[in-house]
Amino acid sequence: MTIEFNATKREGQGSSASRRLRRAAQVPGIIYGAGKDAQPITLDHNELYHLLKKEAFHASVLSINVEGAKETVVLRDTQWHAYKQQVLHIDFQRVDASQKLHLKVPLHFVNGDNAPAVKLGGNIIAHVMTELDVQCLPSSLPEFIEVDLAALEAGQSIHVSQLKLPAGVEAVHHGEGDPVVASAQTTRGAAAAEGEGEAA
């Protein structure tokens, strides 16, 4: 389901205009890309704040209604106030249905409590990555990628190459190797008990 929300065209630009908007509970933003001119926009702070709390808002194709004109976009950047729960500025990139997107998608870890590493090995599972860089067409963009921990044994790890990615979705690697997504690690208590057992 596409997330839809409203925005208006922003006329005044610059820091003083942005401050006036924020005092009026509005957020300055911009829509750019797809070979078109950048469009400065204004959004309602309260609506945007609650949208940003949704995980799907960060990894979905979004639809912005700008005074009756629909823009299909993805979220690219959000600037927050240093200590207030206030959005200062937001950037959206237009989506071309025929062009692949490069975006971070959240990872959802399942069956961790049933993993042999936990049930039999007394391990804890460390989530080394919480999101994955992917590349795909907009129509193939998943809201999240599931990481099944059901078969994870004590001392083992799950790597990016072992993830079951949806059709048309590729993982984007930064650097060499096959990054670790999650690993089963011995707890201090279990390690101490094991050491005592060996000593006996």
From Swiss-Prot:
Residues 1-20, 179-200 are annotated as: Disordered. This is one of the proteins that binds to the 5S RNA in the ribosome where it forms part of the central protuberance. Part of the 50S ribosomal subunit; part of the 5S rRNA/L5/L18/L25 subcomplex. Contacts the 5S rRNA. Binds to the 5S rRNA independently of L5 and L18. Belongs to the bacterial ribosomal protein bL25 family. CTC subfamily. One of its GO terms (cellular component) is cytosolic large ribosomal subunit. The keyword DNA-binding does not apply. The gene is rplY. Coiled coil: none annotated. Transmembrane segments: none annotated. It comes from the Bacteria. HAMAP family: Ribosomal_bL25, Ribosomal_bL25_CTC. It comes from Azoarcus sp. (strain BH72). Pfam families: Ribosomal_L25p, Ribosomal_TL5_C. One of its GO terms (molecular function) is 5S rRNA binding. This is Large ribosomal subunit protein bL25. Keywords: Ribonucleoprotein, Ribosomal protein, RNA-binding, rRNA-binding. One of its GO terms (biological process) is translation.
